[in-house]
Amino acid sequence: MADQTNPWDTAQVADTTTQTADAWGTPAGVATDGGSTDWLNSAPAPAPEHFSLLDPFHKTLIPLDSWVTEGIDWVVTHFRPLFQGIRVPVDYILNGFQQLLLGMPAPVAIILFALIAWQVSGVGMGIATLISLIAIGAIGAWSQAMITLALVLTALLFCVVIGLPMGIWLARSPRAAKIVRPLLDAMQTTPAFVYLVPIVMLFGIGNVPGVVVTIIFALPPIVRLTILGINQVPADLIEASRSFGASPRQMLFKVQLPLAMPTIMAGVNQTLMLALSMVVIASMIAVGGLGQMVLRGIGRLDMGLATVGGVGIVILAIILDRLTQAVGRDSRSRGNRRWYTTGPVGLITRPFVK
């Protein structure tokens, strides 16, 4: 036993040091677990999961999300300059449409659009277009409507330039059509919001990425209906043209495309409607126009602002739908009259045409 009066007793010093180091005051008789020094991580290890036929999908079997993420990251790393180069023609054409539509005074643009509608679809449609465009301007949505129209027209132009030749090629190559058709199905059934993430990573945000995602979303209808229209041309007409010595080019431009034009224009109509709907959804990636008004109205709970944008979208959709339907009428429904003998153009040319 240590002497309590001896200050040099080492046993007493060691005992005091041990008590001082034990900050938690653990009693001497209590045994401590040497393996649980890290008390923050001392939770028991989870039990291993075993595959069960009753619940086979409890754990992810195919890590598709990580595969897609890694694939997109690889594409962005290696091909982003290529996609930035694709922006150039889209940006050029979009700026041209915007400068044209926004540069014209509103009364001039309204009269011009009304005359075009009269020429394409008759005087009734011309009057309806005039009243509708005046209504868009009266509710304070004119400039935003012109931006939306520029976006839609740009996307429609690229869809026609890409989709029409692709449809002709696939109509002539059934083997290629079997390969491309599942891709068109995927493009048409994929939710519109899914396109936004990779487009933002590859192109950024703004009007140009909005046009690109609109082109991707709205392209399948014109391709499908071009294939359908060409395949529906009667076989006896094709045989008759071949018997008269028509070349493949003459067969295409003088027989197949004219007879398939109503179906192709139905595809243009569907593409136009999808483009208009996608431009509104693309407002989430900073695309301007009427869709941005709707998005701001939703974000601020401003029912008035959202209603103005929605009414403008509805009016534009109705006008564009009726005009493309009128263009798609075949010659038999319009009669034997030439286009330049009707409408406002006919009023000007009538004195000079016998």
From Swiss-Prot:
Disulfide bridge map: none
Q: Name one matching Pfam family.
A: BPD_transp_1
Its biological purpose: Part of the ProU ABC transporter complex involved in glycine betaine and proline betaine uptake. Probably responsible for the translocation of the substrate across the membrane.
| UniProt membrane topology term | Multi-pass membrane protein
Q: Name one GO biological process term.
A: glycine betaine transport
Keyword list, A-Z:
Amino-acid transport, Cell inner membrane, Cell membrane, Membrane, Transmembrane, Transmembrane helix, Transport
Q: Where are the transmembrane segments?
A: 100-120, 122-142, 149-169, 199-219, 271-291, 301-321
Give yes or no: UniProt keyword Nucleotidyltransferase. Answer: no
Locations listed in the record: Cell inner membrane
> What spans are recorded as compositionally biased (Low complexity)?
9-23
Q: Does the keyword Cell membrane apply?
A: yes
This entry's Gene Ontology molecular function terms read: amine transmembrane transporter activity; carnitine transmembrane transporter activity
Provide the induction entry.
Induced in response to increased extracellular osmolarity, this is the second gene of the proU operon (proV-proW-proX). Osmoregulation requires curved DNA downstream of the transcription start site in proV, which is repressed when bound by H-NS. H-NS may act indirectly to influence the local topology of the promoter.
GO CC, any one term: ATP-binding cassette (ABC) transporter complex
- Sequence segments annotated as region (Disordered): 1-28
Which of the residues are on side Periplasmic? 121, 170-198, 292-300
> Which family is this protein grouped under?
Belongs to the binding-protein-dependent transport system permease family. CysTW subfamily.
The record's annotation in NCBIfam families points to: PRK10952.1
Name of protein: Glycine betaine/proline betaine transport system permease protein ProW
User: Assembly and interactions?
Assistant: The complex is composed of two ATP-binding proteins (ProV), two transmembrane proteins (ProW) and a solute-binding protein (ProX).
